[in-house]
């Protein structure tokens, strides 16, 4: 994905990837029973359920700040045609998530030892809401609106809204590969 792109194109790309990734995750996790979701085939790795829980926790940390940002911001009909580019911090976060190298999850996003009941359907429902939120935000200026990362201290620079959407999709796609790998070992 180019680092400079019209916002409308970024929206289209992120939307397509989010939907495709959600469907891929659904196809993998829906056939799994509770024991399989909680099984740890990799001794030091997360179970499929913990990966799903991690994605739910991370999404939940962005939910209220995004709702508040959208509530206090104005729509801008010209925004989809304007160039979007990542902020410095947003580009760094997305870039690190795009690399295949294993990363430690920030403490604030770490799942507990046991995922919530119905974690698979919870994540799939959250992903439907994410696509709707992104669609609802299409007429806002993603480069101008700023949002904090819950993984960073409050004094850290804010990223732009497009970064938030991009990081969410890159993060989901990254973990879909982990889910696929772990589920294949069950």
Q: What label would you give each PLM region?
A:
Residues 38-93, 128, 132-186:
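Short, contiguous alpha-helical
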Residues 18-22, 123, 130:
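Amphipathic alpha-helical coiled-coil segments
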Residues 1-19, 23:
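Extreme N-terminal tail/first-helix region
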